[in-house]
């Protein structure tokens, strides 16, 4: 797959990410003024690309929703997944970074097609396991949850809720993403102090804020400010960063999320590209554990067929029963923690606003994240988005 095609596919993947982020951040899905959320669009993208690999007639709709460059271009999705797994998610860095895991749990009464199994193992670097859903569904659910707990080093202990699989379940496609990064410039914990954070309902809470007097990557606009916090690099070329998108208005998160979803190039146009001196610089510590069942949200994005009796997943298993297979649920859970050390998480046309004229004493930029904001973690060379979320109340962890 050509470099241009990969970049186009990544742009489509980013649009998928921000559309989901907008849906999760909308008032209808957010849980009041304390509904913090975090999810991995990349993890969902990889899992649904696996479904596309096993789909026949359903493939066009999956490819369109996931942002394939052309109609029904499942090969493009797999090429992107292969590039992402081998380049972005290869955890060869001593400084940490992401690790991705895929696993297909299939009932022992079915046999995976060799072509599908080869794709899982070859391009997605995943595994397949034969299990007994028909007589041991609760035990299999426990097995899946134990697998997730192990590969996320205990950050996520359960992905399948009680009763989510039963004797009619035939397949579980699992994908997990774990990320740990240390800031290039860590915050001094002795300077962390409780400050006021304003909630959407007009009230406020006291929460620990990190601060710094060092120059920061910040871009300023009329309606928002964007902060870039780079993570330490290892021995490779990958560059991971967290971005904090802070609307100017205390209740501006909804409008910001909508802009992200309707203007695919919005993020690239607002990237901070250079460091600026800071005046007040305060960022709250936060920890988010967020899980949701994603099928209704995906249906809202136009992905209907895989969840219906019209689903055609006949390229997944070698059996007459393949015609009756469909996706019943999509369970997703993420954990993100931001503190003085860095981040632990599981699950170019950019322009910078520069000073008109540089005075002898550079103008200092304030960045005080004391009201609801969006955040994302991405790999900067490729633009791949690993995690997206929003913070309504830093004191609420779940």
UniProtKB/Swiss-Prot annotation:
Query: What keywords were assigned to this record?
Result: Protease inhibitor, Serine protease inhibitor
Checking SMART domains in the record gives: SERPIN
Instruction: Please tell me the species this chain comes from.
Output: Hordeum vulgare
Report if keyword Cell wall biogenesis/degradation is assigned: no
The protein here is known as Serpin-ZX
Positions of the site: Reactive bond? 356-357
Q: Which domain of life is it from?
A: Eukaryota
The record's GO CC annotations read: extracellular space
Its job: Inhibits chymotrypsin, cathepsin G and trypsin in vitro.
Spans annotated as RCL: 342-366
Could you list the residue ranges that cross the membrane?
none
Q: In which tissues is it expressed?
A: Expressed in roots, coleoptiles, shoots, leaves, embryo and endosperm.
Q: Does the keyword Nuclease apply?
A: no
What lineage is this protein's organism placed in? Eukaryota, Viridiplantae, Streptophyta, Embryophyta, Tracheophyta
Do you know which CDD domains this protein is assigned to? serpinP_plants
Record GO terms (molecular function): serine-type endopeptidase inhibitor activity
Q: Which is an annotated Pfam family here?
A: Serpin
Domain remarks in the entry?
Answer: The reactive center loop (RCL) extends out from the body of the protein and directs binding to the target protease. The protease cleaves the serpin at the reactive site within the RCL, establishing a covalent linkage between the carboxyl group of the serpin reactive site and the serine hydroxyl of the protease. The resulting inactive serpin-protease complex is highly stable.
Task: Tell me its family.
Answer: Belongs to the serpin family.
């Amino acid at each position: 797959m050509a470099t241009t095609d990969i970049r186009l596919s990544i742009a489509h993947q980013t649009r998928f990410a921000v559309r989901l982020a907008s849906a999760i951040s909308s008032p209808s899905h957010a849980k009041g003024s304390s509904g913090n959320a975090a999810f991995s669009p990349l993890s969902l993208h990889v899992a649904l690309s696996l479904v596309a690999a096993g789909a026949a007639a359903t493939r066009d709709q999956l490819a369109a929703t996931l942002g394939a460059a052309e109609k029904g271009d499942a090969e493009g999705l797999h090429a992107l997944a292969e590039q992402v797994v081998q380049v972005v998610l290869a955890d060869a860095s001593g400084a940490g970074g992401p690790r991705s895991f895929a696993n297909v749990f299939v009932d022992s009464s079915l046999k995976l097609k060799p072509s599908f199994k080869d794709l899982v193992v070859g391009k997605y670097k995943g595994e397949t396991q034969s299990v007994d859903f028909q007589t041991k569904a609760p035990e299999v659910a426990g097995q899946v949850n134990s697998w997730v707990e192990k590969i996320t080093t205990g950050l996520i202990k359960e992905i399948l809720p009680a009763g989510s699989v039963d004797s009619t379940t035939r397949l579980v496609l699992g994908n997990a993403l774990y990320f740990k990064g240390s800031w290039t410039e860590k915050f001094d914990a002795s300077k962390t102090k409780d400050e006021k954070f304003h909630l959407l309902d007009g009230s406020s809470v006291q929460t620990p804020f990190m601060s710094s007097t060092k120059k920061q990557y910040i871009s300023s606009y009329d309606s928002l400010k964007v902060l870039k916090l780079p993570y330490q690099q290892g021995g490779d070329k990958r560059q991971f960063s967290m971005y904090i998108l802070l609307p100017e208005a205390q209740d501006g998160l909804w409008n910001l999320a909508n802009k992200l979803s309707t203007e695919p190039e919005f993020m690239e146009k607002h990237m901070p590209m250079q460091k600026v001196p800071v005046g007040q610089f305060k960022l709250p510590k936060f920890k988010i554990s967020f899980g949701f069942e994603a099928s209704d949200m995906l249906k809202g994005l136009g992905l209907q067929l895989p969840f219906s009796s019209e689903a055609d997943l006949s390229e997944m298993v070698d059996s007459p029963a393949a015609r009756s297979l469909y996706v019943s649920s999509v369970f997703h859970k993420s954990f993100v923690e931001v503190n003085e050390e860095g981040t632990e998480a599981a699950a170019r046309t950019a322009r910078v606003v520069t000073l008109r004229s540089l005075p002898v004493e550079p103008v200092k930029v304030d960045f005080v994240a004391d009201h609801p904001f969006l955040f994302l973690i991405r790999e900067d060379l490729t633009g791949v988005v690993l995690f997206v979320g929003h913070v309504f109340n830093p004191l609420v962890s779940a």
